[in-house]
């Protein structure tokens, strides 16, 4: 990761919560080629860190992310529009694909508006909290392209085919209250409390048994594409190793003793 990219994608871990911050407020937090690699590295780093139990993704300033920064040219070197677009497209899918496959729960704190790739990045997170002054826009068809980063897969599953088609085909901008009504975000909070709200939720998740939370996420992901009978079978297979963990014993003991559990993640 380059020094510039590390400044554009900030990373910190505290109290079992990793926070990844897109930090280019002067260009509406648009994402450059090197930042795509940095985002991927940070997401994988957090997921592999046994101390991290929840991940927050947010932005600095008035925007969460206004999309990709195509003005920076070809991140892979060389010249020519076709080569530049080809390399950019190769890089675009990486962070959303990583997000989709992470076991660690992810929270998007939409501190500001998200458009295009920024919207897809937000949709890739498990939970979305949204500032009351933020907006969402697909904004792909107006640029002559498609939502290449998972939006066409996620949106119909979140809000149904008809509404997803309307949003993708028109690129219409949504205000925060409509995003909440449609189920695109879990809740809308005052803009000046978005960071605190996301952290409070992350800490609440981090207080649960981490192996159980991760297994629950895997089961939810698998359940999107399998029958009920297959899913129940896979849930049973997840339960067997959980019964052998220290956290299971601690969870049972804390319940019987009417005290707060102290989970170790093992």
Give the residues covered by each predicted segment.
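Terminal low-complexity tails and localization/encapsulation signals of metabolic enzymes
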Residues: 1-7, 253-266
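C-terminal long alpha-helix characteristic of the crotonase
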Residues: 25, 129-134, 185-246, 262-266
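Acidic, divalent-metal-coordinating active-site segment for phosphoryl/phosphodiester hydrolysis
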Residues: 172-178
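Glycine- (often His-adjacent) and acidic-residue-rich active-site loop
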Residues: 37, 59-98, 114, 142-144, ...
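Conserved CoA-thioester-binding segment of acyl-CoA-metabolizing enzymes
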Residues: 1-60
């Amino acid at each position: 990761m380059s020094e510039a990219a590390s400044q554009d994608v900030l990373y910190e871990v505290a109290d079992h919560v990793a926070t990844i911050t897109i930090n280019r407020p002067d260009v509406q937090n648009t994402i450059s080629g090197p930042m795509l690699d940095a985002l991927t590295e940070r997401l994988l780093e957090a997921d592999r860190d046994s101390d991290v139990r929840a991940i927050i993704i947010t932005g600095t300033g008035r925007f969460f992310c206004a999309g990709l920064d195509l003005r920076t040219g070809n991140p892979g070197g060389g010249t020519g529009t076709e080569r530049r677009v080809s390399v950019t497209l190769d890089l675009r899918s990486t962070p959303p694909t990583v997000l989709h496959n992470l076991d660690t729960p992810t929270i998007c704190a939409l501190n500001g508006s998200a458009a295009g790739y920024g919207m897809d990045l937000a949709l890739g997170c498990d939970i979305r909290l949204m500032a009351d002054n933020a907006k969402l826009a697909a904004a792909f068809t107006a640029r002559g392209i498609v939502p290449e980063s998972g939006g066409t897969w996620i949106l119909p599953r979140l809000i149904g085919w008809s509404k997803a088609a309307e949003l993708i085909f028109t690129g219409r901008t949504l205000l925060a209250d409509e995003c909440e009504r449609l189920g695109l975000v879990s809740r809308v909070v005052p803009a000046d409390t978005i960071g605190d709200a996301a952290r409070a939720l992350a800490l609440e998740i981090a207080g649960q048994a981490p192996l159980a939370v991760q297994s629950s996420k895997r089961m939810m992901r698998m359940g999107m594409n399998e029958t009920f009978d297959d899913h129940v079978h896979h849930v049973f297979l997840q339960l067997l190793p959980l019964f052998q963990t220290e956290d299971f014993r601690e969870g049972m003991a804390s319940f019987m003793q009417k005290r707060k559990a102290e989970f170790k993640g093992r």
